[in-house]
Swiss-Prot record:
Residues carrying Phosphothreonine: T101
Family per similarity comment: Belongs to the NOC2 family.
Organism per entry: Drosophila melanogaster (Fruit fly)
Pfam short name (any one): Noc2
Protein known as: Nucleolar complex protein 2
Ranges where the record places region Disordered: 1-73, 100-154, 674-766
Amino acid sequence: MKLATKKIKTLGKSKPDLSKKKPAKDAIRKTKPQTTSETKVTPRNPKQKVAEPVKNGKTTKKGFKKSHKEELEGLKDIDPEFYDFLKNNDKKLLDFNLLDTDDDDDEEGDEEDKEDTVTKESKDDEDDEEKYHKPSKDLEVASDESDFEVDEEDDAAAGGIQKITLNLLHQWEQQLGQANISIDIVRKVIQAFNSALASISADGADGGENKHNAAAFKVVGAAAFNGVIQLCVIHLQPAIIRLLGVRPNSSLPLHKHKKWVKVRGCLRYYLTDLIRLVEQVSSPNILGVLLKHLHQMAGMVVPFSALGKTILKRLVVLWSTGDETVRVLAFLCILKITRKQQATMLNHVLKAMYLAYVRNSKFVSPNTLPGINFMRRSLVEMFALDLNVSYQHVFLYIRQLAIHLRNAVILKKKDSFQAVYNWQFINSLRLWADLLGASANKPQLQPLIYPLVTIATGVIRLIPTAQYFPLRFHCLQTLISLAKETNTYVPVLPLIVEVLKSNTFNRKHSAVSMKPVQFTCVLRLNKGQLAENGFRDEVIEQVCGLLLEYLAHESTSLAFSDLVVPTVMAIKTYLKECRNANYARKLKQLLEKIQESARFIEQQRGKSSVTFDIKDAQAVAAWEQQLRLKRTPLDVYYASWLKTHETKKRRQAAHTDEINADYDVPKLKKLPVKTGVPVRNENGEVELFPSDSEDEGDDGLHLGSDDDDDEDVQEEEEVEVEHPKAKKAKKEKPEKQKPRPATVEDDYDEAGGAVDIVKDLDLNEW
């Protein structure tokens, strides 16, 4: 116990010894620079407390290393062999400079830590006072005018990259307009164009083959970008023409000039960038400008076959899916590029354009129909460039149509029928019929007329029901156009007259449609449309129009009077059973013109001028040509009908109120909202059928002479039924003034009705 207490006492005595070191630490703290009274002294972290002993230790270690270095230096004189051994086996031991450098770095690090500690406390006041950043009052705002200024500092910082400014572009424009053009300025402009594309690319870098040129210039801002594009589009092509020394009337290709080698490489890069820009642009206006420029550069695409295929591929896409103006410009570019290298490019272009035509003619609507018609006409022009090359394609594609038709006839399944009864098939028939008609004076494609006529006739007879009457009329129109253009007899009259014998057509309609049915963009009708009166009206219009068009063309034939005998008999048979006065009137008028033309032909044949043999084809053709100059009665009637029909078609496409009036469509007046108060006129009398029309004497029905008597009777009955309803409105609010009894004569005058309740009917609302 005594020993234990002694140990405890000794431990207790050791405490004052430790406390003696505190004044030394306080003395060290006092040596630090004093801060202002406003600053707050922050306590030291643990790392700062152990900084001084470490420093002392490093100082001792440095002296030890210094003495060790001297000993090793002395070893070189005392034992050279051992020194060489260390030098060969342990070089680090003798690397005194490396050791000294590490020590110096440690010392410098300690000094920097010490200085940071001092400056940190001295800047506490500034951190508190300037806690928030205060911007300068002399800041400058960037604007588009900075594009005119050359920023030399940016150029130096960018490592030689020159910034495109409007002043620089103006200098280039002047250099491009000079008579003697340097190849260097052309290369600079093309490099600037590449840099402009790199500035708008998705990843911000140039994705083309001219990637190294993009580092030469830097395009910043919309003004600089537009300036570069405008410079290339307007001034580059004329400058290259002057550089090559092309004469105005020279027929020598551009790639055969002497200086072509100098511009070949940069032009290849430029055309690549140009078509890449065309792919990225979606604005029709900008596309139009770029395509016009590409049309000027078409002669420079010839030497680059691979690049030419890429350009044509993109142009075909624009030709088939772009805006109307873009379509036309794309086709002009395709035509110009293809004609300059027709031997190598025509096959690829024809195949690509036909596939694009079929792909984009799958659906036909009033909006897509003009584009499809343009593609068909332009594609006919492309096939007509070389009929020998086109024959292989036309024969192959007509054969594909025949295979689809054969499968439908043999299999008789829904899928096989749908492969034939679709817009792609019908538009293909139209395309080949137009092509054969356009090349009628050349013998290369004439053997394909008979297969095409056979296919079209087979399509009509595949499903001869009333639901597919629109498709039948489309095929008949194609055959009639082919017969007129090729001057070939095609037996379409039986296919037209057959429609009049349809039970569905002759059945009385069970539904009334105010809006007429149009077959222009329709191939098939549903059961509801078959029951409407608009279906029968359109069928009669189509039958009369097709008969008139075909017979007007054949009216100058030597055998016309014999040709129309079956048709005349079929029309007379239908007129005996027809109950609709409108249909009977139209067919009677057509029948009279047919018979009049037949008598005219018989008179011409009975004259003494016909002295040739019927087997003499040339004499028959000459006689028919003279007859065309005299104009047959049916031909004159068809010309007047066609003029009226085309006018109605153009107005129908416009969808205006004036068109509806010209179409004799009745209009409906919208009655005011019923508020329980009867509408009175100026005399205080109740109006049974109020109207907004100011002209009370105008006939608003516009029904004309085409209306049936039965329909007129029904309208009178409807008017008589509505009179009691108007009298009920009179009883709701009694007045002292007794209204005069309403009669039918009050609302309808001798002209047929001054007040019209169906005057403002808009077809778009139904």
